[in-house]
Amino acid sequence: MEEAAWIGSLAATGAGALVGAAASDAWQTARDGVVALFRRSGPRRAALVAAQLDTDAEMLAQTDPADRDQLRRQLLPAWRTRLADLLAEHADEVGADSAVAAELRTVTAAVLAELSAPQQTWVQRVHASAPGAIAQGVQGGGNIVNHYGEAAPTPASTDPAGR
């Protein structure tokens, strides 16, 4: 099943806030919020996520501040995937209005409120709606993620080269 555009967008925003918060004053808010989200899938999964968060935060804390952005780029795709999987697992028939989606939005907003401006650069907010809308974002230092809406009809090109 193809991932819904809202899942990719929300997971990317949440993951950006999470890795941006690591090794910062906003870390505890981010960690506690994400662990609470995964607790919905059971205590074992929440414990595994908590352990991974602690490992990632420790790695970032031990990394030279000049090299932290590179490590964050490496951590970002895994957290985006984990959050996307969680959102898809709990989307049910309500989709973007699920309790998990609402809670992730709340956690992300709380973390953003605590992050300094340089740390907020890790959070990318992309929203596109309407027929033919395209949302594109760069993650992990060069990975481009595209979400396409329903294509709008386009007039035929009059250029012989097809442009």
Regions from the PLM with identified roles:
Residues 8-16:
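Pore-lining and gate-forming transmembrane alpha-helices of multi-pass membrane transport proteins
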Residues 16-29:
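Short hydrophobic alpha-helical membrane-entry/anchor segments
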